[in-house]
Amino acid sequence: MSIENLKSFDPFADTGDDEASSSNYIHIRIQQRNGRKTLTTVQGIPEEYDLKRILKVLRKDFGCNGNMVKDDEMGEIIQLQGDQRAKVCEFLITQLAIPKKNIKIHGF
C-alpha cells in the first residue's frame, strides 16, 4: 500500500510550459536612477521590427532621450529617460499592432 499524500509538492516550481509563453511577452519596466530620475526599459520586441527605427520614433514622439543596450540574456533592450510606460504601451498597441495581452508593464 502506497501513501500518495506524503509526496513533497512545490507550488512555485516551474512546470516547464512557461518558457515558450514568457518569450512572447514584451516587458516594459521602470527603474529608479538618482533622485527623482527614472529610466524606462523595453525588452522582448520581436526580431521582425527594426529597433533602431522604433527608438528614433519613440524619442521624437515622447521628447526624451534614449538608447539601445545589448544584453547577453535579454537581447536588445530599449532604454528611455523618464516614466514612459503608458506611452510606450499605447505606441506598441497602435503603431506596431501588438496585442495588449502580450505586453507586461512592471514597476512601482
Swiss-Prot record:
Spell out the CDD domains in the cross-references: eIF1_SUI1
**What keywords sit in the KW lines?**
Protein biosynthesis, Translation regulation
Q: Where is this region: Disordered?
A: 1-20
Under PROSITE patterns, the record lists: SUI1 (PS50296)
Matching entries from InterPro entries are given as: SUI1, SUI1_dom_sf, SUI1_euk
Database matches in Pfam families: SUI1
Q: Which Gene3D superfamilies match?
A: SUI1-like domain
UniProt record similarity statement: Belongs to the SUI1 family.
Protein name in UniProt? Protein translation factor SUI1
Native source organism of the sequence:
Eremothecium gossypii (strain ATCC 10895 / CBS 109.51 / FGSC 9923 / NRRL Y-1056) (Yeast)
